[in-house]
Curated annotation (Swiss-Prot):
Gene Ontology biological process terms, A to Z: glycogen biosynthetic process
Subunit structure: Homotetramer.
Name of this chain's protein: Glucose-1-phosphate adenylyltransferase
CDD domains linked to this entry: ADP_Glucose_PP, LbH_G1P_AT_C
Functional description taken from the UniProt entry: Involved in the biosynthesis of ADP-glucose, a building block required for the elongation reactions to produce glycogen. Catalyzes the reaction between ATP and alpha-D-glucose 1-phosphate (G1P) to produce pyrophosphate and ADP-Glc.
Organism: Rhizobium etli (strain ATCC 51251 / DSM 11541 / JCM 21823 / NBRC 15573 / CFN 42)
Entry's EC annotation: 2.7.7.27
Binding site for alpha-D-glucose 1-phosphate: Y107, G172, E187, K188, S205
Entry keywords, A to Z: ATP-binding, Carbohydrate metabolism, Glycogen biosynthesis, Glycogen metabolism, Nucleotide-binding, Nucleotidyltransferase, Transferase
Domain of life, per lineage: Bacteria
Taxonomic lineage of the native organism: Bacteria, Pseudomonadati, Pseudomonadota, Alphaproteobacteria, Hyphomicrobiales
């Protein structure tokens, strides 16, 4: 990695987080909340990763654009991200879609979500803009990307993942030269172009962009005046710059934050039930791919005051126990057994129940003798006594949202419809 400058560029940057997406592939999990507000890792929300990256990178001016079912997200940020102080030249603004440009126009795309708040951005008076997606899980020091942007003289610098070439068909892919200068941006190509130094890999867009502020605002105004534009960074703004300006790729491996226990760059789009379940369950491994215990790069979130977790009963057939599991505060495991499971705060698991491969969101109550395998249980669900999930695929599919790989999403309306 390059050495950091004495005066970090991040101190003259604003992070603008796009957090208005629904995340429809998460199905009922986003019926009541936007995807960035979905719980992750036993304590945090997904958006906390982008926000923590900005804060840990030294960025002290942050704006978050919200739109779809934003109440849960806004409440979380008001509780957990209220420590910025204007007297220290810090600011944290929540920017809901509010028809600032037109009385009939909400945010129409990712670029429009920035354009409609141009006056607020200008008031910040920053030199650089870091545009972030609020729905990915990763650890990254944006200072390195800012440095590359300045050193290369680029109009836009795009954060990119190195992925196996034929796995890149679902991404926007960069066609680059030996200097990582982008000369083509291809959306979801059938035959992705390889990287010059790694022909079996492709550079896929992470949805992270760095601009000089003036250049970005000029580009947004030009795009807003184009009646054919869809007002989207990936579809409109970036292709225009690639064609008419200078775009440079920043490889995630250069700025990925890794502890001594993390060997590979970690980035996940937990946009499906399977991916969400897997990323949470991965945290129960002895040495997980994502180290959320790294104190040098903390994942900031709302620090809810809770009592410690408690395990009770020690009879041969009724023992509160957990193996290879993550159990958060205010959980009571009362004669239940857990294996390879992740529990958020306030979960109650009652006697003789068994959980394996379970991701349990806050304040769930699990009745006696329930047997739950490979499940995601939504916030506040009450699991009835004796419910069995994970043994009969056909029955599970009739009752719950079951994926092809066998993961069951369980919500309270699904439970209310059961005839048991």
């Amino acid at each position: 990695m390059v050495e950091k400058r004495i005066q970090p560029l991040a101190r003259d940057a604003m992070a603008y987080v796009l957090a208005g997406g629904r995340g429809s592939r998460l199905k009922e999990l986003t019926d009541r909340r936007a995807k960035p507000a979905v719980y992750f890792g036993g304590k945090a929300r997904i958006i906390d990763f982008a926000l923590s990256n900005a804060l840990n990178s030294g960025i002290r001016r942050i704006g978050v654009a919200t739109q779809y079912k934003a109440h849960s997200l806004i409440r979380h940020m008001q509780r957990g991200w209220n420590f910025f102080r204007p007297e220290r030249n810090e600011s944290f603004d929540i920017l809901p879609a509010s028809q600032r440009v037109s009385e009939t126009q909400w945010y129409e795309g990712t670029a429009d979500a920035v354009y409609q708040n141009i006056d607020i951005i200008e008031d910040y008076g920053v030199e650089y803009m870091v545009i972030l997606a609020g729905d990915h899980v990763y650890k990254m020091d944006y200072e390195y990307m800012l440095q590359q942007h300045v050193d290369s003289g680029a109009d836009v610098t795009i954060g990119c993942l190195e992925v196996p070439r034929m796995e890149a068909t679902g991404f926007g892919v960069m066609h680059v030269n030996e200097k990582d200068e982008i000369f083509a941006f291809i959306e979801k190509p059938a035959d992705p172009p390889g990287i010059p130094d790694k022909p079996d890999f492709a550079l896929a867009s992470m949805g992270i962009y760095v601009f000089h502020t003036k250049f970005l605002l000029d580009a947004l105004r030009r795009d807003a005046a184009d009646p054919t534009s869809s007002r989207d960074f990936g579809k409109d703004i970036i292709p225009y710059i690639v064609k008419n300006g200078k775009a440079v790729a920043h490889r995630f491996a250069k700025s990925c934050v890794r502890s001594d226990f993390e060997h590979e760059p970690y980035w996940r789009d937990v946009g499906t039930i399977d991916a969400y379940w897997q990323a949470n369950i991965d945290l129960t491994a002895i040495v997980p791919e994502l180290d959320i215990y790294d104190k040098s790069w903390p994942i900031w979130t709302y620090a809810e005051i809770t009592p410690p977790a408690k395990f009770v009963h020690d009879d041969d057939d009724r023992r509160g126990s957990a193996t290879s599991s993550v159990v958060s505060g205010d959980c009571i495991i009362s004669g239940a057994s857990l294996n390879k499971s992740l529990l958020f705060t306030g979960v109650r698991a009652n006697s003789f129940s068994k959980l394996e491969g379970a991701v349990i969101l806050p304040n769930v109550k699990i009745g006696r003798r329930a047997q739950l395998k490979n499940v995601v249980i939504d916030h506040g669900v009450v699991i009835p006594e004796g419910l069995v999930v994970g043994e009969d695929p056909d029955l599970d599919a009739k009752r719950f949202r079951r994926t092809e790989s066998g993961i069951c999403l369980i919500t309270q309306p699904m439970i209310d419809k059961l005839d048991i």
